[in-house]
Amino acid sequence: MYKVVLFDAYGTLLDVDAAAANLAATNRFPELAKLWPELASLWRSRQLNYTWLRSLSHRYAPFWQLTCDALDYAMEAFDLEDQDMRTALLDLYRELDAYQDARPALDAVYEAGLPAAVLSNGNQQMLNHAFAAAGLTDRLDSLLSVEDVGVFKPDPRVYQLGCDRYQVRAEEILFVSSNGWDAAAAGLFGFKTIWANRAGMPVERLPEYPDFIAPSLDFVAEHLSS
């Protein structure tokens, strides 16, 4: 059966919309009140697009740089020029809220006697800071970063990091992600996969389908106890 459970970080354990949502809630920047969902969505989509384009063009840069670049694009798209807003959004992104189902899912892995680890596009400094701020480090055995291979998901070298770190076969790893394309790529690599389909999106038309599809991370506990 499983020997380790790997979790994606951004969008799976950490809420990527939280920076924009939390800043909007302060009313410090009134223009964000209605705009923040669109800003957060474009910021995230550009962030991911930049990972794919940089991987394809062999131009790796730390995920933090791509996060900043994506925010600059999104702000310009919405005619937002306030540098204080930019600084505030990035400060909040360093310390994203954990989803409410993140801690229970990690607790379930711990109670099953398995190591839980993160496998993320995030660079190591980002991950260390984010998970300390989220209060989840006590349940995480390791934080595995693509920084070690200089390429982003869905490159197979990223998923190989999990096998190398724990000296296990791919099929002995359960991988959990809220990104359908990430779950598909991990499955193609050989992991058993759970797609936490938070947004109720259609299944990606890719060569591999997730082994399990659930609306939240609550399924992790159910699956490990079955």
What are these regions (language model features)?
Residues M1-V5, D107, L119, N123-Q124, ...:
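Asp-based, Mg2+/Mn2+-dependent phosphohydrolase catalytic module
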Residues A20-N27, W43-Q47, T67, L89-Y93, ...:
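Hydrophobic alpha-helical core bundles mediating ligand binding, dimerization, or RNAP-core interactions
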Residues N22, L42, D69-Y73, A88, ...:
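Alpha-helical elements of Rossmann-like donor-binding domains used by nucleotide-donor carbohydrate transfer enzymes
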Residues S45, N49-T87:
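A metal-dependent, Asp-based hydrolase signature
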